[in-house]
Amino acid sequence: MELIVKEESKTDYNYGSDPYNRDIKTLLNTGLVVIDKPSGPTSHEVAAWVRNMLNLVKAGHGGTLDPKVTGALPVALGNTTKCVPIWHIPPKEYVCLMHLHDDAKVEDIENIFKEFTGRIHQRPPLKAAVKRSLRIRKIYEIEILEIDGRDILFRTKCQSGTYLRKLVDDMGEALGTSAHMQELRRTISGPFYENEAVYLQDLLDAYIFWKEDGNEEELRKLVKPLEYGLQHLKKIIVKDSAVDAVCHGATLYSSGVSKIEKGIGTDEVVLIETLKGEAVAVGKPLMNTKDMLKTEEGEVVEITRVIMEPGIYPRIWKKRNKNDKTKAESKKK
């Protein structure tokens, strides 16, 4: 990450805090944990267990896994639930065991896998929780790891919302043998990786250790601040004076910008961050990095989702008219 300074600015440490130094109670309400989901429970059940385990009002998962599927399941704690849609932007990766219902030549299998790379058409399966309309999804990578008779172990990196069970069905049909998905494990879920996932029991043990002994060290190793889950986004750093206005949904103006990450375009989502590294909001850039650095006034980012609660930083902005206020409130929903 390369940040370019537009205007040097200092932050007041009387307001806000370093995300990685928040007190443990605040961290639990503005944090996340990546669970290694076991086979059996639904993703909703796992999120509910985490919520009850940590004595929280709410918690939500970032990407449904079927009951039998295992692997990385990010769970948003407390106010972090508003970040979940942002986690779906990067691709997801799976390792799948596919079983053919008849013999097939290795060459034919390899050719079919190549055909299913790139843009594919999918209709969600009968048990899907969404409307079964034809949709386009992108398979970024698909790699055969091992072929053992009728069993094929493969890895794939795909667009969020891709149905792996349907992908296996379609490849089996294309081979002329038919096939089914025998096992599936998610190894990457957006910005989260399998090697950072933790077991539910380990999370419970760490929480009890904190509650009973006052030792929060183990819990801090497992629970990350919400900013950890936004590292995949390019950043715009704003001055303290602009933070509260953005928290109320106001468009970010050039005068409020301190630093800009190199390479920002108008076709992506960017993270608005404080000088301390706190996530304020996400939005759509109205110009690229080069133009943002040049402009002295005007709008630079349209806010699409507010993350930080208003009132953490001082209010240094004028009231807008009622129509602007209504528009800003709609962005916070």
From Swiss-Prot:
Keyword annotations: Isomerase, tRNA processing
Pfam families reported in the protein's UniProt record: DKCLD, PUA, TruB_C_2, TruB_N
Domain of life according to the entry: Archaea
EC code: 5.4.99.25
Class of enzymatic activity (EC top level): isomerase
Active-site residues annotated for this sequence: D66 (nucleophile)
InterPro entries reported in the protein's UniProt record: Dyskerin-like (IPR012960), PsdUridine_synth_cat_dom_sf (IPR020103), PsdUridine_synth_N (IPR002501), PUA (IPR002478), PUA-like_sf (IPR015947), PUA_sf (IPR036974), tRNA_PsdUridine_synth_B_fam (IPR004802), TruB_arch (IPR026326)
Reactions accelerated catalytically: uridine(55) in tRNA = pseudouridine(55) in tRNA
The PUA domain, residue ranges: 233-308
GO MF entry, a single one: tRNA pseudouridine(55) synthase activity
The keyword tRNA processing is assigned to this record: yes
Keyword Phosphoprotein applies: no
Annotated NCBIfam families: CBF5, PRK04270.1, unchar_dom_2
PANTHER family: CENTROMERE/MICROTUBULE BINDING PROTEIN CBF5 (PTHR23127), H_ACA RIBONUCLEOPROTEIN COMPLEX SUBUNIT DKC1 (PTHR23127:SF0)
Biological role: Could be responsible for synthesis of pseudouridine from uracil-55 in the psi GC loop of transfer RNAs.
Assigned protein family: Belongs to the pseudouridine synthase TruB family. Type 2 subfamily.
Protein name per its UniProtKB record: Probable tRNA pseudouridine synthase B
Species in which this protein is naturally found: Methanococcus maripaludis (strain C5 / ATCC BAA-1333)
Taxonomic lineage: Archaea, Methanobacteriati, Methanobacteriota, Methanomada group, Methanococci
